[in-house]
Amino acid sequence: RRSLPELDSNHIQPLKKEMPSELGSFNETRKRYEFYNGSTIQFQYLERDSDCDRIQGTEIHIALVDEAGQMTPYQLGYIKSRMRLGNYTPQQEGFLPRLVMTANPGGQSHNFLKALYIDPAPAESYFFDHTMRDPNNPADKGWLTMYIPAKMSDNKYIDPSYASSFSALPEELGRALREGDWDLVVG
């Protein structure tokens, strides 16, 4: 997310409400959930590109980026550059870093996301993210990637009247958001 209030209301507060206290506790100062087994869930917002400095040196195993279309291409690339798993054993190979992003059509990274994740292959088909390829290893094809489309109607938890609120938007954008159609709008 782009701001602490967005991060707090959409992710931190729901997690604090749902996470059983037997598993760990939330550290308000560090904005992270600390499990008693030593694992953590770190919450971070990136309002400006310069905020990426706060995650420099961070080893991220799993990154979950909500509303990726609102981030800049630089921020999304920087997050990807922090994805690593140091000193892992062959048994841990299946736990290599994972990046999951959610995004709606539109936003400042619309064209970036569409070109990198939506256009390269049919929906729900694996392909390689060539930007995550080791240039010194000709055998490395990049990260295995998949685009999973979604429509507003796929979310059974949304109030049925929510769709009507999109009538206040330009018609093409409202339709793109309802249908999850990345071809309807230009970022």
Q: Predicted regions span which residues?
A:
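Phosphate/NTP-binding elements of NTP-utilizing enzymes
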Residues: 1-187
